[in-house]
């Protein structure tokens, strides 16, 4: 990755993937968009992209985790402790906000398991598995991805008998398949940096993969015949799409656009709030502003981002409270 010296762009940090920053930003936008169906009113079909956002987030997690080697299983407790200290202060912070402003009171067990939501338990389980793979099977990641895909195909063949079936909906199939995206991110992290390809070619491939993903998904998901099995094929272009988006984000020509001083701070700030936005968005999405459509979407997004930022600040205070060092207030309010 070439270092950019132009005054209009930010100063590059060595060994930092700015493509990951872009993917986190895209993941947040897609996850948020998929949850605001009631705010779209008559245009609810536009509330899509949640699965793409989820797998982008898992890809980013796998990538950053494998940038640092995992050498010994004895190091796992301290390694896992760092994951806990990153995620659960935000979970507790959002629980406090829910209690103070949304009159929602949960017991500690409900809070720890994240209010019966799938995402936090899923990623905490992923951390355990991926660490073991990092220690004992790092060189077999491709084989593991293939094996998980086969398991997912068998699971899909059994579960899809229940029509209609959404493989990216409320099903354990996505727990199986989405782990492959974390593994793909880990594989890319091991191989980082990669050789640059044509940006035009990458954009065309990403667009084609996006179209194929939706074609296979919608045909299969809405079919009551054997065509429903086509839905599983959507997993393949989704895999390609994530990889190509990462390669686009790492391309110097793309970085010349999104790494401008007036653009990148916004991308980094929003992308850095991905976890907190996921946790707080449910309590701020409303249809009371639908008469302002499409302005209501922007207003809700702004409210979610502001609340997520305060949740992250509170999470950092909680985290620092249990450390021996003095409070670092600059770190608490840091934007990105």
Regions found by a protein language model. Give the residues of each.
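Short glycine/serine- and small hydrophobic-enriched flexible loop segments
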Residues: 64-67, 134, 186, 190, ...
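Extracellular, surface-exposed passenger/stalk and repeat segments of large secreted bacterial proteins
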Residues: 32, 168, 188, 226-229
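Alpha-helical transmembrane segments and their membrane-interface exit regions
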Residues: 61, 118, 179-186, 236-244, ...
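Long hydrophobic alpha-helical segments that form multi-pass transmembrane helix bundles
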Residues: 150-191, 195
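Alpha-helical transmembrane segments and terminal signal-anchor/GPI-anchor hydrophobic tails
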Residues: 172-179, 193-303
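Extracytoplasmic catalytic-loop and juxtamembrane helix elements of membrane-embedded
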Residues: 107-112, 170, 226-227
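Membrane-cytosol interface segments of multi-pass membrane proteins
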Residues: 1-155, 160-161, 195-207, 254-269, ...
